[in-house]
Amino acid sequence: MICGIDEVGRGCIFGPILSAAVVFKKKPSFIKELDDSKKLKKEKREYLSSLILENSYYAFAEISNITIEKINIHNASLLAMQTAYENLKLNCSLVLVDGKFVPKITAKNVKAIIKGDSIIDEIKAASIIAKVKRDKLMDKYDKIYPLYLLKKNKGYPTKEHKNAIKKYGVLSLHRKNFKLI
């Protein structure tokens, strides 16, 4: 079994970092449609996410902004990937993670693949379901904090988001040690 893992929200200034681990039950018919979540339109991501969830074993992990502040974004990213794999509760012969660094995963073979979210189908799938899940979380937070335009910026440091922070203040879910805050 091959597991792909990716994270989203690393460059955000609001909310958690979120990762997903994906193992396909069998080679899916939609495999050629997969791509890095950042390259797909929202509708296509959501469509593919539902197909991925139906046709794979998967797990998620969220690392809070408070933990990110304590251990830094790099370590939080690795922890998110490690935790997603642990939440999967499968023993995979090969675990492929997006990026340069290998998290502490107890599998026979773990490899970091630079640009893996554009190359490896399992990582592409993890990238898609993680992005859809985090975007939905930001949409929920937007209803609570509408002045910060989280539905639009998804927690990233856009001009509008930074202006909202200046005007309305820093929220408890903002990453306070981020240089922009």
Swiss-Prot record:
Function noted in UniProt: Endonuclease that specifically degrades the RNA of RNA-DNA hybrids.
GO term, biological process aspect, one: mismatch repair
Note on cofactor: Manganese or magnesium. Binds 1 divalent metal ion per monomer in the absence of substrate. May bind a second metal ion after substrate binding.
NCBIfam families named in the record: PRK00015.1-3
EC number(s) per entry: 3.1.26.4
Necessary cofactors: Mn(2+); Mg(2+)
Keywords: Cytoplasm, Endonuclease, Hydrolase, Manganese, Metal-binding, Nuclease
First-tier enzyme category under EC: hydrolase
Similarity comment text for this entry: Belongs to the RNase HII family.
Chemical reaction(s) catalysed: Endonucleolytic cleavage to 5'-phosphomonoester
Name the record gives this protein: Ribonuclease HII
Keyword Hydrolase: yes
GO cellular component: cytoplasm; ribonuclease H2 complex
InterPro entries named among the record's database cross-references: RNase_HII, RNase_HII/HIII, RNase_HII/HIII_dom, RNaseH-like_sf, RNaseH_sf
Molecular function via GO: manganese ion binding; RNA binding; RNA-DNA hybrid ribonuclease activity
Sequence positions that bind a divalent metal cation: 6-7, 98
Domain of life: Bacteria
Domain named RNase H type-2: residues: 1-181
Compartments, record wording: Cytoplasm
PANTHER family (UniProt xref): RIBONUCLEASE H2 SUBUNIT A, RIBONUCLEASE HII
